[in-house]
């Protein structure tokens, strides 16, 4: 009689378990519980505007020009002449249409209110030291350069804007056909040249008195492929100015043209022209955003709705608006990236009956105790359950998550560059994106980012199978012939494997020989003890073989007799 026993242990690969699951969204599995997450979004709160970190931020065009609007500075109002500091970012702080405190301007006729915005969009801005043309000797002259008491100079005498010359005919106060003057490019550093010009109109009496012609006058400017036409309005202006300045019966219309390096512009005019004088020379790019002054402190990002923001997450939810700097990107819903493994309750051994009732050893759930890692090994035996984390596998999983974060960051940068590029394309227009187009673009980018996060979560969760398969191959190689693969990532060892053994497996220092020699307790065969006197082993074997042979012969004879009877070849009679 043989009795077979086993002192083997079972070693399995496994995943950590957690009792605090989080939820992430995936592309195909919907919402999935995981052991940890990295929040990718934040919802900002409103704050004051600030200087943008790492760069110069411009508030007012001329900080030292007191009681001056940015339009005053842009037009060169006599008491508003000063240096405009260079800046990589600018705040459009005058949220309402702002007029000049000088001669009353008909703002609605032109895009003159956009002139300060245009200048804000340049990093470097300077006013030329010389006049672009000699206004007194321009065609249709000679002219007297007009001034106004509503535009006083620094000595409180009559003055006018430094960027324009009010050309009043000196002697020949008569009507004239359209005249043409070329405006040369005079900037010296390859800058854009912003040339300001305009025209004056009044009631009929004043038009005759100043220009000798009471009819509407025609004006045209052309530069850089852009041509603009105007016809002056005669009379009909309220006596009190919209600027709250001195009462004026007349008005001026002011416009500008942008001349590229080396390219001249032209102005076609009649009576009442305001000829260009000093010009703006501008270069570089400064990002513009609507905001408020003063600027307090520093911030990573300037947001039209939230003010100064310090970036803590790559994305934000809440109100979408234009922003500049190192800003999070707007998304519709909060986003989370999986930072761990798929949630599993504490593991149990499922006793599935296989061939001869063997335990299959399939593991369900995760194992508690893998404090230092997400993946690892478990050992089951007389010692109970031992658990050890595999740091290398865990690090590989973390590296994959980091790679996903970097990919999302690259996507963020590309989208920011796309938005920035779109803004630069409109730079020479008004430097403001159309809100509807901007919202549509933001929705599209938000959808792209959300899909990228869903796919990243899908990949992170699905990669668990890869990590476990790699662990299984590693475990099989280390155990070698000292264990039998029983499937589902489990191996039955021919030796004991307690916590020390498992820790060495996790550390990659396991040596099967070290555990097999002293601790091997392989299949034990215990022989039955027969105590008949005078019998040795050879005699016992002889008895066994004789009995077995006799039994075999008897069975063969019995089978032959039954066969012959069934064929009627042999008859059998039983008599009493």
UniProtKB/Swiss-Prot annotation:
Q: Which GO terms describe its biological process?
A: endocytosis involved in viral entry into host cell; fusion of virus membrane with host endosome membrane; fusion of virus membrane with host plasma membrane; virion attachment to host cell
Cytoplasmic side residue ranges read 566-576
> Where is this gene product found?
Virion membrane; Host apical cell membrane
Q: Which UniProt keywords apply?
A: Disulfide bond, Fusion of virus membrane with host endosomal membrane, Fusion of virus membrane with host membrane, Glycoprotein, Hemagglutinin, Host cell membrane, Host membrane, Host-virus interaction, Lipoprotein, Membrane, Palmitate, Transmembrane, Transmembrane helix, Viral attachment to host cell, Viral envelope protein, Viral penetration into host cytoplasm, Virion, Virus endocytosis by host, Virus entry into host cell
Name the Pfam families on file: Hemagglutinin
The record's section on InterPro entries has: Capsid_hemagglutn, Hemagglutn_HA1_a/b_dom_sf, Hemagglutn_influenz_A/B, Hemagglutn_influenz_B
Which regions face the Extracellular side of the membrane? 1-544
Q: Name one GO molecular function term.
A: host cell surface receptor binding
Assign the protein's first listed, main location to one coarse class: virion
Question: Do you know which Gene3D superfamilies this protein is assigned to?
Answer: 3.90.20.10, 3.90.209.20, Hemagglutinin Chain A, Domain 2 (2.10.77.10)
**Record bears the keyword ATP-binding:** no
Q: Which Gene Ontology CC terms are recorded?
A: host cell plasma membrane; membrane; viral envelope; virion membrane
Membrane topology designation: Single-pass type I membrane protein
Positions of disulphide bridges? 12-490, 68-80, 102-151, 497-501
Q: Pinpoint the site Cleavage.
A: 353-354
Q: How does it assemble?
A: Homotrimer of disulfide-linked HA1-HA2.
Q: What else is known?
A: Major glycoprotein, comprises over 80% of the envelope proteins present in virus particle.
What's its job?
Binds to sialic acid-containing receptors on the cell surface, bringing about the attachment of the virus particle to the cell. Plays a major role in the determination of host range restriction and virulence. Class I viral fusion protein. Responsible for penetration of the virus into the cell cytoplasm by mediating the fusion of the membrane of the endocytosed virus particle with the endosomal membrane. Low pH in endosomes induce an irreversible conformational change in HA2, releasing the fusion hydrophobic peptide. Several trimers are required to form a competent fusion pore.
The molecule here is called: Hemagglutinin
């Amino acid at each position: 009689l043989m009795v077979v026993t086993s002192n083997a242990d079972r070693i399995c690969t496994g995943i950590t378990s957690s009792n605090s699951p989080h939820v992430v969204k995936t592309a195909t599995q919907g919402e999935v519980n995981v052991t940890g997450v990295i929040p990718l979004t934040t919802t900002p709160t409103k704050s004051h505007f600030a200087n943008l970190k790492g760069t110069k931020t411009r508030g007012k065009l001329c900080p030292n020009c007191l009681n001056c609007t940015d339009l005053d500075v842009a037009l060169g109002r006599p008491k508003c002449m000063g240096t405009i500091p260079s800046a990589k970012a600018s705040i459009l702080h005058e949220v309402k249409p702002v007029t000049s405190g000088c001669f009353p301007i008909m703002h609605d006729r032109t895009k003159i209110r956009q002139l300060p915005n245009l200048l804000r969009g340049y990093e470097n801005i300077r006013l030329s030291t010389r006049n672009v043309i000699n206004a007194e000797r321009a065609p249709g002259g000679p002219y007297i350069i007009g001034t106004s008491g509503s535009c006083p100079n620094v000595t409180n005498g009559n003055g006018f804007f430094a960027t324009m010359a009010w050309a009043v005919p000196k002697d020949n106060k008569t009507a004239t056909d359209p005249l043409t003057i070329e405006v040369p490019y005079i900037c010296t550093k390859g800058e854009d040249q912003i040339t300001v010009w305009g025209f004056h109109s009044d009631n009929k009496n004043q038009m005759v008195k100043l220009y000798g012609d009471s009819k509407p006058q025609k004006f045209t400017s052309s530069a850089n492929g852009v041509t603009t036409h105007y016809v002056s309005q005669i009379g009909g202006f309220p006596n009190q100015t919209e600027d709250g300045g001195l009462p004026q019966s007349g008005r001026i219309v002011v416009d500008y043209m942008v001349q590229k390096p080396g390219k001249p512009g032209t102005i076609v005019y009649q009576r009442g022209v305001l000829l260009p004088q000093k010009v703006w020379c501008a270069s570089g790019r400064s990002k513009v955003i609507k905001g408020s002054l003063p600027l307090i402190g520093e911030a990573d990002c300037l947001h039209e709705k939230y003010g100064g923001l310090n970036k803590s997450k790559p994305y934000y939810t809440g109100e979408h608006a234009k922003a500049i700097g190192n800003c999070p990107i707007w998304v519709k819903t909060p986003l989370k990236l999986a930072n761990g493994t798929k949630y599993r309750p504490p593991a149990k051994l499922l006793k599935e009956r296989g061939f001869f009732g063997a335990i299959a050893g399939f593991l369900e759930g995760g194992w508690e105790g893998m404090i230092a890692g997400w993946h690892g090994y478990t050992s089951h035996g007389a010692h109970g359950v031992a658990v050890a984390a595999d740091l290398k596998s865990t690090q590989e999983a973390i590296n994959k998550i980091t790679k996903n974060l970097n990919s999302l960051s690259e996507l963020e940068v590309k989208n920011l560059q796309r938005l920035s590029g779109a803004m630069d394309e409109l730079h020479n227009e008004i430097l403001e994106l159309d809100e509807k187009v901007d919202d549509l673009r933001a929705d599209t980018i938000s959808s792209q980012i959300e899909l990228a996060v869903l796919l990243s979560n899908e990949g992170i969760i699905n990669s668990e199978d890869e990590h476990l398969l790699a662990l299984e191959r590693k475990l099989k190689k280390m155990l070698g012939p000292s264990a039998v693969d029983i499937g589902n990532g489990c191996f039955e060892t021919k030796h004991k494997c307690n916590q020390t053994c498992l820790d060495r497996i996790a550390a990659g220092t396991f040596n099967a020989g070290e555990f097999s020699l002293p601790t091997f307790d392989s299949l034990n065969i215990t022989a039955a003890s027969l105590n008949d006197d005078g019998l040795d082993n050879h005699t016992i074997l002889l008895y066994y073989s004789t009995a077995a042979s006799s039994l075999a012969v008897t069975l063969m004879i019995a089978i032959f007799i039954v066969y012959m009877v069934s064929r009627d070849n042999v008859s059998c009679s039983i008599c009493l």
